[in-house]
Amino acid sequence: MLSPKKTRFRRQHRGRMKGLASRGNHISFGKYGLQALEPAWITSRQIEAGRRAMTRNARRGGKIWVRIFPDKPVTIRPAETRMGSGKGSPEFWVSVVKPGRILYEMDGVTKNVAKRAFGIAASKMPIRTQFIFSEIK
């Protein structure tokens, strides 16, 4: 599973997901992409599940790029703990995804294969997504 090797601080504020993605919203590496249509936190487990599903579906052909990285720690307090005594310990990592962000890219396969693979990966995601393709490559 993906997680940062080293961070400056162990804990982060939750923050809020306003607006559209201003970065990472264009296809850069491949020919096909999976684009987020809703804001959400996507966990490292979900990213990995989507990547595995796509790899299995595309079989030998094609290359896959994961365009998001989980760099935000989510803390959880133990069950039945009294208030106070600080913030909980980091339990898992998430990637903050805004609408328009490209989640995965793929190249080296036909459009039908890419669409089917992205469809399976999209079912692993907690948000609505759309299949997009680049006219240039």
Curated annotation (Swiss-Prot):
* Major place of residence: plastid
Transmembrane domains' residue ranges: none
A single Gene Ontology biological process assigned to it is:
mitochondrial translation
Cross-referenced CDD domains: Ribosomal_L16_L10e
Alphabetically list the UniProt keywords.
Plastid, Ribonucleoprotein, Ribosomal protein
Localization per Swiss-Prot or TrEMBL = Plastid
Please give one Gene Ontology molecular function term for this protein. Answer: structural constituent of ribosome
Pfam families assigned: Ribosomal_L16
- CC terms in the record's Gene Ontology section: mitochondrial large ribosomal subunit; plastid
Entry's InterPro entries? Ribosomal_uL16 (IPR047873), Ribosomal_uL16_bact-type (IPR000114), Ribosomal_uL16_CS (IPR020798), Ribosomal_uL16_dom (IPR016180), Ribosomal_uL16_sf (IPR036920)
Write down the NCBIfam families for this protein, in alphabetical order.
rplP_bact
Q: Which family does it belong to?
A: Belongs to the universal ribosomal protein uL16 family.
**Subunit annotation:** Part of the 50S ribosomal subunit.
What's the protein called, per UniProt?
Large ribosomal subunit protein uL16c
